[in-house]
A protein has these predicted regions:
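C-terminal catalytic/substrate-binding lobe primarily of soluble NAD(P)-dependent oxidoreductases
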Residues: 1-189
Length: 189
């Protein structure tokens, strides 16, 4: 588990992965813990005009402590990772009709208001598609359709935030997801 990079006051800082654990309550997902992980990647350079950016992973309470324990036991060391991975994949395998979910909150704190974008998606029984496949896979196929429909015709490799900065591209992707019942809500407080 690599260290978590984030922007604090326009500076890239590093914190240990699985640190800064907090409990969050969701109406649809229940009680989850959030902890630092290294998910910002390209956002650290493409969005460095934003003073503070932090990404946390959500899991059921106790997950971070378990992973820290595994790390401290050396189970994620190069010599043990294959055995550990095999064990974890077996333990985490879902039953055939077990409902899993994906939840994502993007919280934007301004001087005058806070805007939260919320996504909650579950396993689709009719198509037998996991929520993670739906939320990431449909976004990828929407991006391919952007190119096929000539809505995005720049050449090269672009991180998602550059594509999404084009309002037409962003609206196309959100509508593509909506048509597949992947809904992102917006709340201002």
């Amino acid at each position: 588990t690599r260290p978590a990079r984030m922007l604090i006051d326009h500076e890239v800082i590093t914190e240990p992965a699985l640190s800064d654990i907090e409990i969050m309550e969701f109406q649809d997902a229940g009680r989850l813990e959030a902890f630092n992980t290294d998910g910002l990647r390209s956002l650290l350079s493409t969005m460095n005009h934003i003073p503070n950016l932090k990404e946390k992973t959500l899991r059921f309470p106790g997950h971070a402590a378990l992973m820290l324990d595994y790390r401290n036991q050396g189970l994620f060391d190069e010599s043990n990772i294959e055995k550990t991975s095999k064990k974890l994949f077996q333990e985490w395998k879902l039953d055939e009709n077990e409902i899993e979910f994906t939840v994502l909150d993007i919280i934007i704190k301004g001087e005058m208001k806070i805007i939260t974008y919320h996504l909650y998606d579950e396993f689709d029984l009719s198509s037998r598609t996991s929520s993670m496949a739906r939320t990431t896979g449909y976004t990828a196929t929407a991006s391919i359709n952007l190119i096929l429909d000539n809505l995005f015709n720049s050449r090269g490799v672009f991180p998602p935030e550059i594509v999404g900065a084009n309002i037409n591209c962003m609206e196309f992707i959100l509508e593509y997801l909506r048509q597949r019942n992947v809904i992102i809500s917006e709340k201002t407080h």
